[in-house]
Every structure is written in C-alpha cells, then in structure tokens.
C-alpha cells in the first residue's frame, strides 16, 4: 500500500490500476513481492484504492463570430511523427476569485504539452502566448506542422492565425462544435483537471499557476500514457524513431498524415 501511495503522491492521485502495476512491477520483484495484475486489482479494490470514473463537460468555445473558419485538414487521419500535428484548446480553472482559463498546445503524436498559458481572461492573447511557448519549445522546427483547434474566436482571430502562419504553421479546425473532433485536446484537459487537482476550486491565480506548472511537468515527464504504449510524452518527443502501438484497442482504421 505504501508503494501505491508514494507513486500517486509523485505522479498523480488518480493514476489507475494498469499504470500502477506496470510502473511498480519491478519494485515488486526487487522486494520479492509475488503479485499478478488481477491480484493487484483485488488489493486496490480491497483497500478502496481504485479510481472512480468521473464525467463532466463545460464549454469554453464561442464560435459565433465573423472571423474566417478554416477547413478540417486532419479528418480520419493520425500523425506519425512529433511536430506534425498540434492540437489546441482552452479549459477553465475555478478559483475563489472567479474563473481562470488555461490554454494548451499539445503535440498529437507524442502527447507532450508544448505550450500553455493561464490567466483570468479568454482573450486571443491567452492562446497566442501558449502558442509562442510551443513554438519556442520546438525540437524539429524545419518539419511541416498543422495546428488543429475548435472554431473559437481566439483561434480564428487574425492575430492568432497570422502569428501561426508567420511561423510556418498551417491552420486546421473542427467542422462543427463537437468535442470528439478535438479529442486529444479534450482528453488532456480532463487529465490535468482530474488527476492533478485543477478541477477543485483553487485559492487564487498564483496558486493555480503553480499547480498548472507542476501538472504539466508531471504530465510530460513522469506520467505514462496508454496511447503511447505506456511511455512518457517527453521520451517519445525526444526520440522520433520510437514507434509505439497504442495500448488502447481501436477498431477504426485511420490513414497517416502525409505532410
């Protein structure tokens, strides 16, 4: 039980059973603890350490505007290398002083959060600052890159699209407001909020910023991902030759992006 609690304190209190078993398996061997996955699950259940499922959805998208809306360039396609496709989204963070907002730019292949910005407004500059950080953090700046988002006014604003295009980035957007059209970004929002405490009402913006910084670091460098064959985003991003097969079973055959 101590190993489980120590790992969750380090990586995230909502880390599930499969990831726990995978990460702790060598520790069990080192301490001569003989336990299989099913028995480990029973142990978690017995001690009420299984993570309950949660569900919620609140929109932060306002697509009723006159700005140009771009075509969806990635429909039914998946990336095959880092910095081929970035996905962006905004999520709200509750504080005792009112809502703050967290803009994220994530690499769709490695799942690494490339840039982020937290503030008490949803102006275009929130997203532009996150994108600027992502561009600064590029490891492969000569690679062609698509930026995919919903049709929110921040992403359609010429101040944002022109900044992206000036940096060699091609814009792509969802066809309609449906979170499943930007599923990678939505999933990351959910993970940060539910696994790293950003779902709760936080005392103030300074504390929210500190928690966001810590959450992004853990997410990128310490947390394993089913979609990366239980690898860590930073490792996959640094090593583009590493090809992974998603741990999740997916019956949909999608073509690879060709840019």
Question: What do the PLM-derived regions correspond to, one by one?
Answer:
Residues 112-116, 172-174, 198-199:
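Short small-residue beta-strand/loop micro-motif enriched in glycine and branched aliphatics
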Residues 165-169, 191-259:
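C-terminal domain-tail junction helix/linker
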Residues 61-63, 149-151, 157-161, 171-193, ...:
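RNase H-like two-metal-ion nuclease catalytic core shared by retroviral integrases
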Residues 79-114, 120-121:
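An active-site-proximal beta-strand-loop segment
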Residues 4, 20, 40, 74, ...:
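Mobile genetic element proteins and their domesticated derivatives, centered on retroelements
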Residues 1-82, 232-242:
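Basic, flexible linker segments flanking DNA-binding modules
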Residues 98, 117-140, 156:
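Active-site beta-loop-alpha junctions of metal-dependent nucleic acid enzymes
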Residues 16-17, 36, 70, 83, ...:
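Hydrophobic (often cysteine-bearing) scaffold residues that line and stabilize catalytic clefts
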């Amino acid at each position: 039980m101590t190993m489980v609690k120590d790992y969750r304190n380090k990586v995230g209190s909502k880390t599930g059973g499969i990831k726990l078993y995978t990460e702790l398996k060598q520790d069990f061997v080192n301490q001569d603890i003989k336990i299989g996955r099913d028995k480990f699950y029973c142990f978690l259940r017995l001690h009420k350490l299984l993570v309950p499922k949660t569900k919620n959805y609140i929109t932060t998208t306002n697509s009723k505007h006159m700005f140009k809306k771009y075509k969806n360039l990635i429909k039914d396609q998946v990336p095959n290398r880092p910095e081929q496709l970035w996905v962006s989204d905004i999520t709200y963070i509750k504080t005792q002083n009112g809502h703050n907002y967290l803009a994220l730019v994530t690499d769709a292949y490695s799942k690494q959060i490339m840039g982020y910005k937290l503030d008490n407004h949803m102006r275009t500059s929130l997203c532009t600052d996150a994108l600027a950080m992502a561009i600064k953090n590029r490891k492969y700046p000569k690679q062609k890159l698509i930026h995919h988002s919903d049709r929110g006014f921040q992403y359609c604003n010429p101040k944002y699209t022109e900044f992206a295009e000036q940096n060699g980035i091609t814009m792509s957007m969802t066809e309609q407001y449906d979170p499943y059209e930007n599923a990678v970004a939505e999933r990351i929002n959910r993970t940060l909020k539910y696994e790293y405490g950003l779902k709760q009402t936080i005392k103030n913006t300074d504390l929210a910023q500190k928690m966001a910084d810590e959450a992004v670091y853990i997410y990128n460098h310490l947390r394993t991902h089913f979609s990366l064959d239980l690898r860590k985003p930073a490792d996959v991003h640094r090593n583009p030759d590493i090809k992974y097969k998603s741990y999740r079973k997916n019956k949909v055959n999608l073509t690879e992006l060709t840019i």
